[in-house]
Amino acid sequence: MPEIQTNTLVDHGQLKIQVTSRQRAVPIPNATIEISYTGDPDSVLETVSTDENGQTPVVDLPAPPVEYSMSPSENQPYSEYNLKIHSDEYKPVTISGAQILSGVEGLQPVSMIPEETHTPTEEHPIVIGPHTLWGNYPPKIAESEIKPVNESGEIVLSRVVIPEYIIVHDGPVGDKTAQNYYVRYKDYIKNVAACEIYSTWPRATLEANILAIMSFTLNRVYTEWYRNKGHDFTITSSTAYDHKFIPGKTTYNSINTIVDEIFADYLSRPNVRQPILTQYCDGKKVSCPEWMTQWGSKYLGDQGYAPIEILRYYYGESMYINTAEQISGIPSSWPGYDLTIGSRGDKVRQIQQQLNRIAKDYPSLPTIAVDGVYGESTANAVRKFQNVFGLPETGVVDYPTWYKISEIYVGVSRIAELN
């Protein structure tokens, strides 16, 4: 595939880099990141450092015109950058191919291994392959959207549960050499969506596609599809079997915000307990009359279709949005209402305790009184948390904020991550 010409980079996108320790999900301050074009890795464009929260400032980077991602084009719609990350006491990390689209803020997660760990001095470079709408990937092998679940001995969950982790087999089903990755469910969905659709598309299109990705994934979880065939993973990264996942992939605020808002949702049909295996294709290189097409969903979003209208256009009128009853790996569930100034009780006390624990590792967060009363100091701490973790700075604990606080609290409280 030809390298993108830098003289076509007439627009700009943004990139923010978040650096954490792989041993524990805590930030790494004072890491330095050198940014260069992937096609010219030795010419450093910019050098940035992480703050006390392990985050860099938002960096403006040249990108191709936004029009390149709005319809199928002969022109690559994103620019590609290499990142070299260094920090005292950690092994260096190199990322090749971070993708930047016009007008969209990308978030690049970086996980570093402590220097004393008994692994090679430098990790293998993380290479981010082409986007599925730009590169060449095998088309999906068609399956029935509802799986038989009455075979003797088959493991099936009794209800739909949002898992804490997905085990991703980074290759085709039968590839014994492919690595398995433990990935938090929300991070997995954000990664897949960033691989499968362009973050510049209309919000309704992004939401419809994210719902299809989540429902497909939860069908694999609910039916224990691969485990029932003797495998030790939840899903593959092969587009022939599942959808694309790329370890280390840049994600985007426009997608991440939606995932944080709707991550417990999936797609249902009447009288069917399991999430529907909603298959899709690009609609240009591959056609799929019974499924959603990604480019087609983009044009429907342009025309003002709502997410459920886009989904019903492709999957039929009987499709509807459902919500999982249970979310794994969190201290307690969303109370069902916002916590704001004037709120009182155990849920407020729990949030105050969790914010104080997070503040031990994220020192820009203030420590607050644990009194079960949601006053100005709690609202300010929530606002600061939202600022650090890319949420709207409202000072109100809404659904996305509740679960983001839970996620970060669990991460910093654990002795070690699964991977």
What are these regions (language model features)?
Residues M1-E3, L9-G13, Q55-S71:
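Charged, amphipathic alpha-helical segments
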Residues V44-E46:
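Short loop/turn microsegments at loop-to-beta-strand junctions
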Residues Q23, Y37-P41, E89-K91:
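Solvent-exposed strand-loop boundary residues in beta-sheet-rich modules
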Residues T6-T8, N30-E34, S49, Q55-P62, ...:
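Conserved, single-site charged/polar hotspot
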Residues V66-E89:
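A short, solvent-exposed beta-strand micro-motif common in secreted/extracellular proteins
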Residues Q18-R22, E34-S36, H86:
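Core beta-strand residues in small-molecule sensory/regulatory alpha/beta domains
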Residues M1-I28, V48:
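Beta-strand-rich domain onsets/edges
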Residues Q14-K16, N30-T32, E80-N82:
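Exposed beta-strand and adjacent loop surfaces of beta-rich binding modules
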